[in-house]
Curated annotation (Swiss-Prot):
Keyword Repeat: yes
Gene Ontology biological process terms, A to Z: neuron differentiation; positive regulation of cardiac muscle hypertrophy; positive regulation of cell growth; positive regulation of macromolecule biosynthetic process; positive regulation of NF-kappaB transcription factor activity; positive regulation of protein metabolic process; regulation of barbed-end actin filament capping; regulation of cell size
Name of the protein this chain belongs to: Myotrophin
ANK repeats: 2-30, 34-66, 67-99
Domain of life according to the entry: Eukaryota
Organism of this sequence: Homo sapiens (Human)
Pfam families found in the cross-reference section: Ank_2
Subunit structure: Interacts with RELA. Interacts with the heterodimer formed by CAPZA1 and CAPZB.
Residues bearing PTM N6-acetyllysine: 4, 11, 24
GO cellular component, as recorded: cytoplasm; cytosol; F-actin capping protein complex; nucleus; perinuclear region of cytoplasm
């Protein structure tokens, strides 16, 4: 399967396309081109429905990418409040530190996200 097409669907919120990839055997925990997992791309781009679907299909909520960034940190860095809320509600580890040595709470100035992380 073509990573670029799958990554495009993840980033752009094409849930039907993502479902098709998974139905055809795409591993929701496979490291894609770029050293990231599907959950990272969805979290980075604020794709809440994609996040929910991938988690339902067994995506590892705390999987680090090649930079040791978790999906929660990805959502925090990009300011996606709804994604942060979902990931926390599903058990994301908020104590993990990013490559800068900061936790998600320490890495954001977004007050809504800080409130969720407290």
């Amino acid at each position: 399967m073509c990573d670029k097409e799958f990554m495009w669907a993840l980033k752009n919120g094409d849930l039907d396309e993502v479902k098709d990839y998974v139905a055809k055997g795409e591993d929701v925990n496979r490291t894609l081109e770029g050293g990231r997992k599907p959950l990272h791309y969805a979290a980075d781009c604020g794709q809440l429905e994609i996040l929910e679907f991938l988690l339902l299909k067994g995506a590892d909520i705390n999987a680090p990418d090649k930079h040791h960034i978790t999906p929660l940190l990805s959502a925090v860095y990009e300011g996606h409040v709804s994604c942060v809320k979902l990931l926390l509600s599903k058990g994301a580890d908020k104590t993990v530190k990013g490559p800068d040595g900061l936790t998600a709470f320490e890495a954001t100035d977004n007050q809504a996200i800080k409130a969720l992380l407290q």
